[in-house]
From Swiss-Prot:
Monomer. One of its GO terms (biological process) is ribosome disassembly. IF-3 binds to the 30S ribosomal subunit and shifts the equilibrium between 70S ribosomes and their 50S and 30S subunits in favor of the free subunits, thus enhancing the availability of 30S subunits on which protein synthesis initiation begins. The lineage of its organism: Bacteria, Pseudomonadati, Pseudomonadota, Gammaproteobacteria, Enterobacterales. PANTHER family: TRANSLATION INITIATION FACTOR IF-3, TRANSLATION INITIATION FACTOR IF-3, MITOCHONDRIAL. GO terms for cellular component: cytosol; membrane. One of its GO terms (molecular function) is ribosome binding. Keywords: Cytoplasm, Initiation factor, Protein biosynthesis. It is found in: Cytoplasm. This is Translation initiation factor IF-3. The gene is infC. Belongs to the IF-3 family. PROSITE patterns: IF3.
Length: 180
């Protein structure tokens, strides 16, 4: 259906004529207290200043209202929330797969990758996979995991260390150490 009624989204704060209280505790443009005044008087002061009257805390007795530019207030609020989102880092779990017979050169390459993941603040999941007859030599797998753990002890904390084999693999999870 074209041209249907648009549902108006509810604002988090009541402004101007939406305020229901008879009297309000008023705060000025610069944050100064102007005392308890009637709603009509508060609306007049806001209109004089050419800005809006915004209800900040409706549950207070009397409700606290502030004289401010509501559009600018919303802009600043969204800008600060975007800044906070930028600063948050999503921790990912990166996986590296080893085998009991992983050669020295491959081991060093995989170790460098693990170091990079941990320095970036991500967790690292080390999966040690057994094939065929390798299942008979589980102690070799444990030696590989212990070697990784010892090589990364300055950078990482072991979150989970395998005590037994799960299926045909052992899994160890490392988390980066907190920076002081």
């Amino acid at each position: 259906m074209k041209g249907g009624k648009r549902v108006q989204t509810a604002r988090p704060n009541r402004i101007n004529s939406e305020i229901r209280a008879q009297e309000v505790r008023l705060t000025g443009l610069e944050g100064e207290q102007l005392g308890i005044v009637s709603l009509r008087e508060a609306l007049e002061k806001a209109e004089e200043a050419g800005v809006d009257l915004v209800e900040i805390s409706p549950n207070a007795e009397p409700p606290v209202c502030r004289i401010m530019d509501y559009g600018k207030f919303l802009y600043e609020k969204s800008k600060s929330s975007k800044e906070q989102k930028k600063k948050q880092k999503v921790i990912q779990v990166k996986e590296i797969k080893f085998r009991p017979g992983t050669d020295e050169g491959d081991y060093q390459v995989k170790l460098r990758s693990l170091i990079r993941f941990l320095e970036e603040g991500d967790k690292a999941k080390i999966t040690l996979r057994f094939r065929g007859r390798e299942m008979a030599h589980q102690q070799i797998g444990m030696e590989v995991l212990n070697r990784v753990k010892n090589d990364l002890q300055e950078l990482a904390v072991v979150e989970s260390f395998p005590t037994k084999i799960e299926g045909r693999q052992m899994i160890m999870v490392l988390a980066p150490k907190k920076k002081q």
